[in-house]
C-alpha cells in the first residue's frame, strides 16, 4: 500500500517559500512532499541517524507521515539542494507516548513538538543556515497560535537555547541511546 502512496505522489513538492536570500538560500514550508525531494530527505536524515540511531532515518514509508498538511515541515535549500529540515508536530500526536504525559500542556493544543531538526554537517556553523531555519520555524509556530515549542535534545544542550527555555524532564534512557535526553519547553 505504501508504494501506491508514492506512485500517487506528485514529482515536485508543493511548498510556500517563506524566506529567500540573494545567495541561493531559501526556506520552504512543505504543504505536500513530492517524489523528487525524497532522495534528498533520506540523505540528510543520515546526519541525524549518526547521532540518534536508525530510528531517526527518513524512509519512503515514513516521509508522508511527517511531511503533510497536519505537520509543520520546513526545508532549507542551498542552490536547490536540500541542506536541512525541521519538522514540527502538534504535541497531541504523541498522546500514546509516555513521555508526552510529563507535559502539562498535552491536550491543550498550544504546543508544537520539534520532531526533527537537522542541517547537513558541511553547512553547520557556517552562514547561519541552521539558526535561520530554527528562527523561522519558531516565528511560524507563533503565527499558528502555538504558545510553546518543545522537543528532546541531548542533556546540556537546551540551556544554550533562548532564555525562555525550561527543562521539563530529563530522560536517562532515550530509545536505547547512551546519553540522557532532556525534554525542553520554550515559551
Task: Explain the meaning of each model-derived region.
Residues 13-61, 73-78, 82-83:
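Short amphipathic alpha-helix that is part of the acyltransferase structural core
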Residues 64-69:
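Short loop/turn motifs at secondary-structure junctions and domain boundaries
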Residues 116-119, 125-139:
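Conserved acetyl-CoA-binding loop-helix of GNAT-fold acetyltransferases
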Residues 141-154:
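Conserved GNAT acetyl-CoA-binding A-motif
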Residues 82, 86-116:
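Conserved acyl-donor/pantetheine-binding loop and adjacent beta-alpha core of acyl/acetyltransferases
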Residues 158-164:
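Conserved active-site tyrosine of GNAT-family acetyltransferases
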Residues 7-10, 14, 168-187:
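C-terminal "cap" of GNAT-fold acetyltransferases
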